[in-house]
Design a protein with these regions (language model features):
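ATP-dependent carboxylate/phosphate-activation module, predominantly the ATP-grasp catalytic core
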Residues: 227-287
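Phosphate-binding site of ATP-dependent enzymes
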Residues: 195-248
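N-terminal-proximal low-complexity accessory segments that begin disordered
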Residues: 1-47
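Well-ordered, non-membrane alpha-helical segments in soluble/globular domains
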Residues: 24-36, 124-133, 156-158, 192-197, ...
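Glycine-rich phosphate-binding loop of ATP-grasp-fold ATP-dependent ligases
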Residues: 170-195, 222, 245-264
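Gly/Ser/Thr-rich loops at beta-strand to alpha-helix junctions
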Residues: 9-12, 53-57, 90-97, 177-181, ...
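A charged, amphipathic alpha-helical module
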Residues: 147-185
Length: 288
């Protein structure tokens, strides 16, 4: 049986990389409030880890309305499901320890070495390869010039304030692991002490960060792909969402894929957009 777990702190926990990591209170509250989110994508016959106190009635209603073949599993019940296959929102040392401590068999959990490899694959720096891919293949309607990875041994002397001078509109520094707009440092008014301190922490904790120009962004959306586990990667749809002026996630726009494609054609010809999507799919398939 598969056991689905919604842990929205997955990317932040990867950045911390400690098994005793504790997410901020707001993220912990989100995990509690949305614990049943996996019922909408869980395979039939699976369990979803959540508290029964305020989730049981809601799940019962959804089961009656939509004939969902999923059931609730609480934390104290984990020893009864020791041989499950855990399906978290994202793996990291903290969720591994939580499942192990709860009673899941260690053989059913990823090893520390596997988590290290997963962490490197999840690093934001991997996205820089796509910039080079689009550049060398001369793909129209793409941007990304000026994005780079800053690596060092943790000493602030390894990065010069002059590095930001080439960006007329300023630049943004991004942690290698973060989510929902966290882990961003905006440099709009020169290399201030706050920016310098942020860079020092990023170099010390993660040995690097990504630097990008501040683009004249219109809106946000994402392409979503699914790996079938047998070497095939499929495009499954779009996600259109909203962020604030600091890049923090604020919510999603409920819309169909067709409506997203109609919207995007205001800015990019559809044929060019499909070429970009297809190249992304092929590159992800090769790189996974």
């Amino acid at each position: 049986m598969k056991l689905y777990v919604f842990n929205p702190d997955a990317d932040m926990a990867l950045g911390n990389n400690e098994e005793n990591y504790m997410a901020p209170a707001t993220i912990r509250r989100m995990a509690e409030d949305l614990a049943l989110l996996p019922i909408w994508y869980a395979q039939p016959g699976s369990g979803v880890l959540a508290s029964s106190a305020y989730n049981a009635d809601y799940l019962k209603q959804m089961q009656q309305l939509f004939r969902l073949d999923v059931h609730l599993v609480t934390e104290p019940e984990l020893p009864d499901y020791a041989d499950v296959r855990v399906m978290p929102w994202g793996w990291n040392p903290a969720i591994r320890k939580r499942m192990l401590k709860g009673g899941v068999l260690e053989k059913n959990l990823p090893t520390p070495d596997a988590l290290d490899k997963y962490r490197m694959k999840a690093a934001r720096s991997n996205a820089l390869a796509f910039r080079a891919l689009f550049y060398f293949n001369k793909i129209d309607y793409t941007c990304g010039d000026g994005c780079c990875l800053v690596e060092a041994d943790g000493r602030m002397t390894d990065i010069s304030p002059d590095i930001v001078d080439r960006y007329k509109e300023g630049c943004v520094f991004k942690s290698l692991w973060s989510g929902s707009g966290k882990g961003l440092c905006w440099c709009r008014h020169g290399f201030t002490k706050n920016v310098s301190d942020w860079c020092s922490r990023a170099l010390k904790e993660n040995r690097g960060f990504v630097m990008e120009p501040i683009f004249d962004k219109v809106e946000d959306f994402a392409m979503e792909f699914y790996s079938d586990g047998r070497g095939k990667l499929l495009f499954v749809g779009y996600s259109r969402f909203v962020t604030d002026d600091k890049g923090a996630y604020r919510g999603n726009i409920l819309t169909s894929d067709e409506q997203v494609e109609e919207w995007i054609q205001q800015y990019v010809p559809f044929e060019a957009f499909v070429r970009i999507r297809n190249m992304m799919q092929k590159a992800l398939e090769i790189g996974k």
